């Protein structure tokens, strides 16, 4: 018997064999599934077969086992589905929430009979991934890659995450697009949840808003509908209690309602980002946060809303996290095991693993063993594997002896100037840095910019938004909006200001606006047949607004330094025209009549 799930907006039918059979928009009766061959709604992926008989009969490789049967029992919140698969000798239990304007699917449990893996000492089932949703939909006029929504003037169909853990994606075909949501073992299988929205286009953002409120997500819809999202921002890297009045004067002269303060306004820095992570207050703040609070009160009193610009994943190579003892929570892109003891005077490091592909840029050739940082000149790619020409005690770290078998690694040095490295988001260091940022933010900031967001660990589609979210979650009060240097699916909920094209100096600013964000905006509107729309702007098709670039922002301080260079420490207040900085994002307003993209998908 088919499984029928119905809410106020749509009716979803899954066949008894596990395929999506129909998705009807109730207001019009439109069928929203592709007429192509049905696709299994659920599936499970294993790295190889583990059941002995399946392993012997089939190739040992990463394999997808599609659903081949479903049975349903109703629950107070919707339904509980028990799903079986081709060949895989177990079943999945999926909880379905039927909300008025969305359906949510969460992996609740597994049913593994004793006969499935007899005598094997292993965790069962050996699932690497579980597909929560697979939906084949026909192409529509627009596709928003960021939120994973296909829409036109009449209807919108979207598969999106209900928490930070699922991998959300799509695959375009000639006549259709496959929307998918997957729970991943290394992040979370049980409890991972994704949602399906099928709605009239005019009601789509309302449905997303319901999901955000029900699952206590950042309020992306509410933020995109606020007046603040459309305001220009005045940016400065050198606003302090001593010169804040001049900055306010320039901002008011330019008509700016928002002022974005780079973290160097508050904290000591040198050599690019070399001290990032310390968050030591500048001398101009003897009372630290209290001095910042009084300065921000002045900005608020002038009718300007202050925001904080920071790099939340960067750790400066001269910070206390790197020297004199490098923190074990710094991210290593490769791991190496010492094949011989490393004594204090040694300049050759012998390891068990092949260093092929290790960093060749001289600024990035840094190994970490224990608390010591070591640079190298070269390495061998045949046994014995060796790093040669090593300089011990780099960046003032303590030179030590290291025993055979000690595991170290290649430090994840930031590509932006190599004055910092990236922290490991799987450790407590991300939360430790978030606490420092939140303490400063609480002095009176109301929005923020997640700079350096691309500096995360793989899988990037999870860790880029999750690193932002771990900071966002600690900020009080919640930001009116945020911007970032990178985004992925879950960022949509908190990164309502989008991405900033933020490295261009004044002399080329207008040219770069035309080359990048101005080119991006109309591309967001194209029918994406067989191609992926970049980034993520699109939005409510019938809300009466369009989106373009946020108007050009100016600052009275020096222009933002290119990544990896030191912010200017000059106390001189330059005219605004000498320090224009781009904040090109997609928001809910059109930019001076330019071709624009819809707001916010």
Model-derived features: positions:
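Short, flexible loop/turn elements at secondary-structure junctions
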Residues: 85-87, 98-100, 109-111, 265, ...
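Aromatic-lined carbohydrate-binding/catalytic grooves of carbohydrate-active enzymes
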Residues: 226-335, 412-438, 443-458, 462-466
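Flexible loop/turn segments at secondary-structure boundaries
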Residues: 266-271, 313-318, 375, 397, ...
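N-terminal accessory beta-strand-rich subdomains and adjacent acidic, glycine-rich linkers
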Residues: 1-224, 549-550
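Autoprocessing Asn-cyclization modules and mimics
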Residues: 312-399
């Amino acid at each position: 018997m088919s499984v029928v799930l119905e809410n106020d907006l749509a009716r979803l039918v899954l066949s008894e064999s596990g395929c999506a059979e129909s998705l009807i928009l109730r207001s019009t009766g439109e069928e929203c599934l592709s007429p192509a061959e049905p696709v299994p709604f659920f599936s499970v992926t294993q790295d190889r077969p583990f059941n002995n008989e399946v392993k012997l009969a089939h190739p040992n490789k990463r394999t997808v086992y599609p659903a081949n049967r479903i049975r349903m029992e109703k629950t107070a919140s919707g339904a509980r589905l028990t799903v079986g698969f081709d060949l895989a000798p177990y079943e999945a239990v999926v909880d379905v929430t039927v909300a008025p304007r969305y359906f949510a699917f969460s992996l609740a449990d597994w049913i593994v009979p004793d006969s499935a893996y007899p005598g094997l000492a292993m965790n069962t089932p050996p699932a690497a991934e579980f597909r929560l949703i697979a939906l084949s939909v026909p192409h529509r006029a627009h596709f928003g890659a960021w939120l994973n929504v296909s829409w036109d003037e009449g209807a919108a169909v979207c598969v999106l995450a209900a928490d930070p853990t699922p991998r959300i994606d799509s695959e375009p075909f000639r006549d259709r697009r496959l929307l998918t949501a997957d729970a991943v073992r290394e992040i979370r299988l049980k409890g991972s949840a994704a949602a399906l929205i099928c709605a009239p286009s005019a009601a789509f953002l309302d449905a997303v808003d319901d999901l955000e409120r029900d699952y206590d997500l950042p309020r992306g819809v509410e933020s995109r509908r606020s007046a603040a999202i459309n305001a220009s921002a005045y940016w400065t890297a050198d606003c302090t209690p001593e010169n804040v009045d001049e900055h306010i004067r320039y901002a008011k002269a330019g008509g700016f309602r928002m002022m974005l303060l780079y973290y160097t306004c508050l904290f000591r820095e040198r050599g690019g980002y070399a001290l990032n992570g310390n968050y030591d207050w500048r001398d101009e703040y003897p009372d630290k946060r209290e001095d910042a609070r009084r300065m921000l009160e002045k900005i608020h009193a002038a009718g300007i809303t202050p925001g904080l610009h920071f790099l939340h994943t960067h750790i400066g190579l001269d910070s206390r996290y790197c020297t004199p003892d490098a923190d074990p929570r710094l991210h290593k892109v490769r791991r190496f095991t010492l094949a011989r003891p490393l004594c204090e005077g040694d300049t050759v490091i012998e390891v068990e693993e092949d260093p092929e592909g290790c960093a060749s840029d001289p600024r990035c050739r840094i190994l970490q063993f224990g608390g010591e940082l070591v640079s190298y000149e070269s390495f061998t790619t045949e046994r014995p594997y060796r790093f040669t020409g090593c300089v011990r005690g780099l960046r003032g770290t303590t030179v030590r002896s290291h025993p055979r078998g000690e595991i170290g690694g290649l430090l994840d040095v930031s590509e932006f100037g190599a004055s910092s490295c990236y922290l490991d988001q799987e450790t407590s260091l991300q939360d430790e840095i978030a606490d420092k940022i939140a303490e400063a933010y609480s002095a009176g900031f109301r929005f923020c910019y997640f700079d350096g967001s691309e500096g995360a660990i793989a899988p990037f589609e999870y860790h880029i938004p999750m690193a932002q979210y771990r900071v966002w979650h600690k900020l009080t009060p919640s930001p009116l909006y945020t911007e970032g240097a990178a985004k992925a699916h879950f960022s949509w909920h908190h990164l309502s200001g989008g991405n900033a094209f933020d490295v261009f100096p004044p002399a080329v600013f207008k040219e770069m606006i035309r080359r990048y964000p101005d080119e991006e905006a109309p591309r967001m509107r194209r029918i994406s047949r067989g191609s992926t729309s970049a980034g993520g702007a699109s939005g409510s098709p019938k809300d009466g607004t369009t989106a373009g670039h946020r108007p050009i922002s100016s600052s009275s301080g020096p222009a933002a330094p290119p990544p990896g260079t030191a912010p200017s420490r000059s106390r001189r207040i330059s005219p605004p025209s000498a320090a224009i900085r781009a904040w090109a994002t997609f928001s809910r307003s059109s930019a001076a009549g330019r071709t624009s993209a819809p707001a916010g998908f």
